[in-house]
Curated annotation (Swiss-Prot):
Zinc finger (C2H2-type): 99-123, 135-159, 166-190
Spans annotated as Disordered: 1-98, 193-228, 254-299
PANTHER family: ZINC FINGER PROTEIN 414 (PTHR21695:SF0)
Protein name: Zinc finger protein 414
Record keywords, A-Z: DNA-binding, Metal-binding, Nucleus, Repeat, Transcription, Transcription regulation, Zinc, Zinc-finger
Pfam family, one: zf-C2H2_8
Classification of source organism: Eukaryota, Metazoa, Chordata, Craniata, Vertebrata
This protein's GO CC annotations: nucleus
UniProt xrefs under InterPro entries: ZN414, Znf-C2H2_ribbon, Znf_C2H2_type
Similarity comment text for this entry: Belongs to the krueppel C2H2-type zinc-finger protein family.
């Protein structure tokens, strides 16, 4: 029975408070509402949906970010500084070290390489022809002198000639340069186009050729009616004319003439034709009692 009495007392207190202090009652819900909303919203924010910078702890985090950036820049600066410190000895010597001059008899030293390079120019000045200086030839038995080195070099070529020349193929002349050879070729070609001079009279006369005696002919010594060698223009004569038939082989009549004409007979061409026809018609002879004989004859 105690439970129903409690709500009635609560309702009475709320009514009295509402009648006595209306301003406080209106203010209390406003103050409680943000508390409830804050209590509900605090565990709900999603860190992935919205960055934490825009939550209630914004100003603190904004101050923290620049601090982290400054730390990162500081770390990078220190890293660059360490790299530069490591590369300094490779490119230039450390400060305070003097670089001595490498020329013999010079005890000077310089703090930088640039100063040393400028100092070395005093030891090795550029080559220049001094006023009044003469260059003498070093060849034996030559006392000439020249005001410049270029003239001395040009003069030295007279004493030491290179073993090189350009030879003309027409007149077999030799030249030191190809330009002089080209100039000579114009003159040499003009002379080559002109008619050659007549040869000396001693070369015109030739020794007489001794004539052969008439007995040296082999055909006359053998007593043959026809010579061994005759020109192709001569036509065959005698009884050999009907035997010369150039149709089978297409040869000229002088080539088919027999070598010895003492005994008349058919020429070699007709004999060859007769043997060829005889061999085509007759069959080859078989040996008797051979393997090709019929089986009845061997019984």
């Amino acid at each position: 029975m105690e439970e129903p009495s409690r709500p009635s007392s609560d309702t009475l207190t709320t009514v009295e408070s509402s009648s006595g202090e209306p301003d406080k009652e209106v203010a209390s819900p406003d103050g409680a509402a943000p508390a409830t909303f804050s209590s509900v919203e605090e565990p709900s924010p999603n860190p992935t949906a919205m960055p934490p910078v825009w939550d209630h702890g914004g100003p603190l985090q904004q101050v923290a970010y620049p601090a982290s950036d400054s730390c990162q820049t500081g770390s990078t600066n220190t890293g660059v500084g360490t790299n530069e410190d490591l590369r300094l000895p490779r490119r230039r010597p450390p400060p305070g070290k003097q670089i001595p001059c490498s020329s013999p008899g010079c005890c000077l030293s310089f703090p930088s390489v640039r100063d040393l390079a400028q100092h070395l120019r005093t030891h090795c000045p550029p080559t220049q022809s001094l006023e009044g200086k003469l260059f003498r030839c070093s060849a034996l038995s030559c006392t000439e002198s020249f005001p410049s080195m270029q003239e001395l070099v040009a003069h030295g070529k007279l004493h030491y000639k290179p073993n090189r020349y350009f030879k003309c193929e027409n007149c077999l002349l030799r030249f030191r340069t190809h330009r002089s050879l080209f100039k000579h070729l114009h003159v040499c070609i003009d002379h080559g186009q002109n008619p050659a001079p007549p040869p000396p009279p001693a070369l015109d006369k030739e020794p007489p050729v001794p004539e052969r005696p008439p007995e040296s002919d082999p055909s006359s010594s053998l007593g043959l009616p026809f010579p061994l060698l005759e020109p192709f223009t001569s036509a065959p004569t005698g009884p050999f004319l009907p035997y010369l038939n150039p149709a089978p082989f297409g040869l000229s009549p002088p080539r088919l003439r027999p070598f010895l004409a003492a005994t008349p007979g058919p020429p070699a061409s007709s004999t060859a034709i007769w043997k060829k026809s005889q061999g085509a018609t007759s069959s080859p002879r078989r040996p008797q009692g051979g393997s090709d004989a019929p089986s009845g004859a061997c019984r």
